[in-house]
């Protein structure tokens, strides 16, 4: 219903970051929901939270994108995009101090990937100096529902590299693994996966929404996490992992949280941080705890695992503490890492892309919507560049090697 039922003043102190206050104390989320088919919107509207959204903020088409990136980006999506931008503009004009935009989308289908990246590039044109953070769900072969996912994902990454400021990389495979292994769920549903994603999103954004001892926002996060502009794809982890509707058995200590959040099993994307090195990382703790203990633990982590952090960026792990824990937990922690091991995911998608593209499989669905093969080639080479950039910085050391010295002589 959009009314606040708690009794904590701090919860309401910055409620206007994500909500507009309407008459009689109702809060309306500043969210725009878009899709190219009406079905999903109908299920949101008839669901438990359907009534809290502003009805005008549902923007949908009738035809669907049929898992086709070109339909989302060039044909169907292009027809709908202006009505979406009108709503976005209206919401942006209501803001006192607009910091940026958050886009949640998947990269495997047609709408989230094609139209999602179209929306991002349009917002980029209109608000060039605002932050653009995305929560992007990458496709994975183990949990696949369309054969053309690698095409859609590669074309999307090509856009995200250029137009997004920070991408939180999520992955259905990793989310399923967490449900199976850690939460011991036998048949996880999308509801369970979304529960994990929402816990992570809540953690990433808690500094924007609540007062805390060490405050950070989207821009500070970007400044601390992105050493090179193209390398803005982050792995996210969360601790403690709980399943929907479960009660937590005992409160974790700060050392346990620190241990868990960096564990590969707690990462929301299917890449193993131990196979690469962290360029930068950030940890956001929530709950009543001593900032001193958090700092000590973080230093401890860096000292014990120094080989997993690049040595040419000193102090590359930042931590922040927010006093208000998530609902149902005493303490929690969200971890965001800019790790070179994320290239495993890009490699995986790229290899599948190349296998199909070499034989030009399924290409007619895209060229039929007016795309050119050239675009596929460009997206593929951009993905290759991204992978080799991650590899280059993974191998980089603080000491200049002989090879560099020769370059200086010539210069």
From Swiss-Prot:
One of its GO terms (molecular function) is metal ion binding. It is found in: Cytoplasm, Cytoskeleton. It holds the Pfam family Tubulin_C. One of its GO terms (biological process) is microtubule-based process. GTP binds at residues 37, 106, 110-112, 172, 194. Its main location: cytoplasm. InterPro entries: Beta_tubulin, Tub_FtsZ_C, Tubulin, Tubulin/FtsZ-like_C, Tubulin/FtsZ_2-layer-sand-dom, Tubulin/FtsZ_GTPase_sf, Tubulin_C, Tubulin_CS. Mg(2+) binds at residue 37. Keywords: Cytoplasm, Cytoskeleton, GTP-binding, Magnesium, Metal-binding, Microtubule, Nucleotide-binding. One of its GO terms (cellular component) is microtubule. Residues 392-411 are annotated as: Disordered. Residues 402-411 have a biased composition (Acidic residues). Its cofactor is Mg(2+). Belongs to the tubulin family. Dimer of alpha and beta chains. A typical microtubule is a hollow water-filled tube with an outer diameter of 25 nm and an inner diameter of 15 nM. Alpha-beta heterodimers associate head-to-tail to form protofilaments running lengthwise along the microtubule wall with the beta-tubulin subunit facing the microtubule plus end conferring a structural polarity. Microtubules usually have 13 protofilaments but different protofilament numbers can be found in some organisms and specialized cells. Tubulin is the major constituent of microtubules, a cylinder consisting of laterally associated linear protofilaments composed of alpha- and beta-tubulin heterodimers. Microtubules grow by the addition of GTP-tubulin dimers to the microtubule end, where a stabilizing cap forms. Below the cap, tubulin dimers are in GDP-bound state, owing to GTPase activity of alpha-tubulin. This is Tubulin beta-2 chain. It comes from Anemia phyllitidis.
């Amino acid at each position: 219903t959009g009314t606040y039922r708690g009794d904590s003043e701090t919860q309401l102190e910055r409620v206007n970051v994500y909500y507009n206050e309407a008459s009689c104390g109702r809060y309306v989320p500043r969210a725009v929901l878009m899709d190219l088919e009406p079905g999903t919107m109908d299920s949101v509207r008839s669901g438990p939270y359907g009534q809290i959204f502003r009805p005008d903020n549902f923007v949908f088409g009738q035809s669907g994108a049929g898992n086709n990136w070109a339909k989302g980006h060039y044909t169907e999506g292009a027809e709908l995009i202006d009505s979406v931008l009108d709503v976005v503009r209206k919401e942006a004009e209501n803001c006192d101090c607009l910091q940026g935009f958050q886009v949640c989308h998947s990269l495997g289908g047609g709408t989230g990937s094609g139209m999602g990246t179209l929306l991002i590039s349009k917002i980029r044109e209109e608000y060039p100096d605002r932050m653009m953070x995305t929560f992007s769900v990458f496709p994975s072969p183990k949990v696949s529902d369309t054969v053309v996912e690698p095409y859609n994902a590669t074309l999307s990454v090509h856009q995200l590299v250029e137009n997004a400021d920070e991408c939180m990389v999520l992955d259905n495979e990793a989310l399923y693994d967490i449900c199976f292994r850690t939460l011991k769920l036998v048949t996880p549903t999308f509801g369970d996966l979304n529960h994990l994603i929402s816990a992570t999103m809540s953690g990433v954004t808690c500094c924007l929404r609540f007062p805390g001892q060490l405050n950070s926002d989207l821009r500070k996060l970007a400044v601390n996490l992105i050493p090179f502009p193209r390398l803005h794809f982050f792995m996210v982890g969360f601790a403690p992992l709980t399943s929907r509707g479960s009660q937590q058995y005992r409160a974790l200590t700060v050392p346990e949280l620190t241990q868990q959040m960096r564990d590969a099993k707690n990462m929301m994307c299917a890449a193993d941080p131990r196979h690469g090195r962290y360029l930068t990382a950030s940890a956001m703790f929530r709950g009543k705890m001593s900032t001193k203990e958090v700092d000590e633990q973080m230093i401890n982590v860096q000292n014990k695992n120094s080989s997993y952090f690049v040595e040419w960026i000193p102090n590359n792990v930042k931590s922040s503490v927010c006093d208000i824990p998530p609902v149902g937990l005493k303490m929690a922690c969200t971890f965001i890492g800019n790790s070179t091991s994320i290239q495993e995911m890009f490699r995986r998608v790229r290899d599948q892309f190349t296998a199909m593209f070499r034989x030009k499989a399924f290409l007619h669905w895209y060229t039929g919507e007016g795309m050119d093969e050239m675009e596929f080639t460009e997206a593929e080479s951009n993905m290759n560049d991204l992978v080799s950039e991650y590899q280059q910085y993974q191998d980089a050391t603080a000491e200049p090697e002989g090879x560099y010295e020769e370059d200086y002589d010539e210069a």
